[in-house]
Every structure is written in structure tokens, then in C-alpha cells.
Amino acid sequence: MCSQRILKLGAKFEGRLESVFLDGALDYVKYNEGRLALEILCEYICEYDVVLSVGEFKEIHELALDMGFELGNAPFKYLQALIKTD
């Protein structure tokens, strides 16, 4: 179930994150490495300063929690700074 959620989330970043990075991160889902896929996707989002909507931020947060990540650790702790504030 988390694998499909990760792929659906990743699709939202098409055109906003270079496809080589997006595809590379999401490719881990094929190998049952969903945790790694989400972590790498979030690292790329942070590294390339991809602007997030509040909804995208919440979706990432919920998914990370469901997968057992500690939200106080990188890369998750840096995502809030990327939320579009207007």
C-alpha cells in the first residue's frame, strides 16, 4: 500500500524535479525499498528546493509517519521550509 502512495506522490513532482532524479528515487519501489524511495525523493526535494504545497507537505508527513520515519531527522525536518506561503 505504501508503495502505491509513494508512486502517486512522486507523480506530483513530474516537471518540478528532474526526471533522472525522480525516476531514480521511485525506481526503488520496484525492489520493495519503499522507505529508501521516499527518503531519497525527499532528499532531492530538499536539495533542489522544490516548492511544496501544504497538501504535499502533509501527504509526505503522513506517509513518512506511516512508514516509521522519525520526522525530526533529515530530510524530513527540512521540508517545512519549502512550503509555498502565499
Please describe what each predicted stretch is.
Residues 1-86:
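C-terminal-biased regions
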